[in-house]
Amino acid sequence: LLFNKTSTMPIKSFQAARQKLVPKRRKSLLVRDYMTRNLITFTKKQSILEVMRTLIRNKISGGPVVDELSRLIGVISEADCIKYLSEGKYFNQPFFDRNVEDSMTAEVDVIEADKTIFDAATLFHKTNRRRFPVLDRGKLVGQISRQDVVKAALLLRSQRWR
């Protein structure tokens, strides 16, 4: 305790008693830290029949199509398969003799692994998609879903967002 020169009232010194505040470790905000890494992928030469079986067996609605260097070249979904089935019936064509490249969607919205979950949230809001392939230097490294972003927000709830 110190005494003020003009008063007899003790003053507590905060200079010496001040504790060093250790900054809290900031939780990561990057897409790469919340994405799903182990994906079921397809190649452009796989048959539509094989894709349908894989989708059903794994209870998924679609997956990325990659080349031999793990570069994303498209996505194939249940909707692509159904469109193909519908067109095959209309043109009276067999539908199991075609490959993924005949039915996949080649123009794909993606997000980079080093973007923030807020960038992902904005992208989800603008496009109304449920998931995005995640790329790192042009290679597919994972997928982020709306649910992944919501989970990240819950984990980060006590942190200020900048």
Where are these regions (language model features)?
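Tandem CBS (Cystathionine beta-synthase) repeat/Bateman regulatory domains
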Residues: 1-162
